[in-house]
Amino acid sequence: METGDLTPKQRVAISNALDLAREISGRCFAAYVGPLEQGRDSAIAKHAQIPGAETSVLIAVDLSSRTIDIVTGTQAAIDIDDRSCELAILAMRSNFAADDLIGGIRSGVMLLAEHARAPRVLHLNDPA
């Protein structure tokens, strides 16, 4: 399945997940499903095309080569470390193995958004 093979309903589901991730984390999330001819280099090039790439996260999935790449901008990488990305990839692979592309992307995006969420700050001066 290439990007053009996604149904409108699937596109909306992915878009909703990306919007929710932005609300949760304050970071811009993007997803790409399609060929990555140069592997990770292609994913990095696609990430660079995102407005505000330094604060953005791209999940790139190449179904034909069965690869998943997560590219984080320099600012996004502060909150989303390699371990978080590996966990998200593991979650996505699990869904993909069950033939659930959209669920996999949604799981990965939500996991990354939760890791990027700013921690709640409790002040000592606030009443309990």
Where does each model-flagged region fall?
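A structural boundary signal for the start of the first folded domain, especially the loop/turn
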Residues: M1-S56, L63-A128
